[in-house]
Amino acid sequence: MHQMISIFLFLTVVSGTIIVVSAENWFVIWLGLELSTLALIPILWFCFTPRNIEATIKYFLVQAFSAALLLNSALIQAWFSGSWSALIPMESFPSLCLSVALAFNLGLAACHFWLPDVLQGLPFIQGLIIATWQKIAPLFLLFYFNQLNFSYFIILAALISILVGGWGGLNQTQTRKILAFSSIGNMGWIVVTSAFSLGTAAMMLFIYLVINTSIFLILDFLSIFTLGHLNNTSQLSPISITLVILTILSLGGLPPLTGFILKFSSLYSLINNGFIFFSSVMIIGSLLSLFFYLRIAFNTTLILFPQHLISLTAWRNSTEAEPLMAKTWLVSSFSVLSILAIPLTIPLYINV
């Protein structure tokens, strides 16, 4: 694909999200979502392999169904109220249709089945766009929607997503599928929190974007597609392995890393509002996900598979790895800053 075409498509994806965030008319919101989706499709099948095309078609079908459901809910709401304004509280049936459409967009349970297969069939960079940027517009819609209509369907779907995200990643060996289930779980955390504290949910979204961007870029630079690649530590420097493990554990919410703020802020907000049961379910789901993240770290650092003695220092003498290591150091700086600096900002957001 020509570079100018790629830039144009990326700008169109960004423009679609900006239109959704700034619009107050349901038709314009639908138009922004469609613009972003249609511009992303050529970017997704950039590699043009059978697995890549299959994942792209799955993503297109899911997003087309979601957009049709959203437009249908907007039409029914316009029929009830006589207006296309998104500022008017919705009736019960269009509210349910919109909740299902947003659940498909965000990959919430039980509308999540497409996400692991799609991310597994795409390269890391394209998967990063779906797991981060494409979640911003539906989440902003959900944030605004929760202020007008409290949807128990969305809350239930988010709680189930936290459990599915933890349970589904236990038997996975593909890193992209692990990241997909992690995305499902983290979306559940953000959605539940948005119903009770919009400011905390916005902060959690920012932290999620930072951590997810870091881990996708690191795994892409190091070409780590399976857990077996992580076990082959002789081909990577200790700095790279440490960075991968810290970022993965941060994604799981291990204190005192960045991801812990995401979980701590949410639980603090829910417990203050008296939702102890919701908090208990979320903690159980978080422990499940943290278990397989800790298992990855254990297998990578404490288990050394049989290999030749010369290969143990191969990374030190390799000249071909220098450009790769330069990219890794660039991402490392970004990741380490996020790991060390963000926990210091807790008092700015929470009055203990």
From Swiss-Prot:
InterPro entries: Complex_I_Subunit_2, NADH_DH_su2_C, NADH_UbQ_OxRdtase_chain2, ND/Mrp_TM. It is found in: Mitochondrion inner membrane. It is an enzyme of class 7 (translocase). One of its GO terms (molecular function) is NADH dehydrogenase (ubiquinone) activity. Keywords: Electron transport, Membrane, Mitochondrion, Mitochondrion inner membrane, NAD, Respiratory chain, Translocase, Transmembrane, Transmembrane helix, Transport, Ubiquinone. GO terms for cellular component: mitochondrial inner membrane. Signal peptide: none annotated. GO terms for biological process: mitochondrial electron transport, NADH to ubiquinone. This is NADH-ubiquinone oxidoreductase chain 2. Pfam families: NADH_dehy_S2_C (PF06444), Proton_antipo_M (PF00361). It comes from Paracentrotus lividus. The gene is ND2. It is a multi-pass membrane protein. Its main location: mitochondrion.
